[in-house]
Amino acid sequence: MAVGKNKRLSKGKKGIKKKVVDPFSRKDWYDIKAPSIFDVRNVGKTLVNRSQGLKNANDSLKGRIIEVSLGDLNKEEEQSFRKIKLRVDEVQGKNCLTNFHGMDFTSDKLRSLVRKWQTLIEAHVDVKTTDGYLLRLFAIGFTKRRPTQVRKTTYAQSSQVREIRKKMFEIMTREATNCDLKELVQKFVPEAIGREIEKASRSIYPLQNVYVRKAKILKAPKFDVSKLMELHGESTDETGTKIAKDFKEPEVLESV
């Protein structure tokens, strides 16, 4: 008799299915908190696997990038064409504390700005804020008709484009290097930098629709929890207050 596996005996019962485990049963929901510079603090929720063994849930959450519309953050529909990127830097309990990580325009807004019969002028520059953030700012602008112009086209000469681009470099560098990241983000919303560029280039060639269309963080300083908590409007003063206690030192005994 040949010795070997009996295939008939080794086969299991047909029709028995594996027990399906819901993957969401091993996950937890965490709240995403935006910095205090925005009106809406609760941005949304994010999922992460529970801490198990050497794997910590907090480590999986840190570094996550969340993209949110500025219209949702400030409850203003007019600002919905700006996309704000937030990065999770700290986890406290079930809250993910975020910091500004970048800004961009929606593609439909950019396409709506580009038209015929005008010159598009773009510039980008690397700037460093007072708190040590290295950013790359991208500016965009379009030529417009002069008040007394009859001609349909508003094309600028290459020499004028170079001059306007130079003004863009100077203004973006000046505005960004004299403030910290929080103040710079607040300048994006009312388009203060764009208005400055428009005003400065009026003598060269009149511009319209001037925006800082994109901001990208290239390098961030060493992470500091106290600064992040300050950005979220929470105190991190760990120095305790001295409490007066009714304590009397016992008298020294002369003999025992």
UniProtKB/Swiss-Prot annotation:
Matching Pfam families: Ribosomal_S3Ae
This protein's UniProt keywords: Acetylation, Cytoplasm, Ribonucleoprotein, Ribosomal protein
Keyword check for Heme: no
Keyword match Ribosomal protein: yes
One biological process term in Gene Ontology: translation
Main location: cytoplasm
UniProt modified residues of type N-acetylalanine: A2
Gene Ontology, cellular component aspect: cytosolic small ribosomal subunit
Molecular function GO terms recorded: structural constituent of ribosome
Compartment(s) where it occurs, according to its Swiss-Prot or TrEMBL record: Cytoplasm
Membrane-crossing segments per the record: none
InterPro entries referenced in this protein's UniProt entry, alphabetically: Ribosomal_eS1, Ribosomal_eS1_CS, Ribosomal_eS1_euk
Family: Belongs to the eukaryotic ribosomal protein eS1 family.
Subunit structure comment from the entry: Component of the small ribosomal subunit. Mature ribosomes consist of a small (40S) and a large (60S) subunit. The 40S subunit contains about 33 different proteins and 1 molecule of RNA (18S). The 60S subunit contains about 49 different proteins and 3 molecules of RNA (25S, 5.8S and 5S).
Protein name as catalogued: Small ribosomal subunit protein eS1
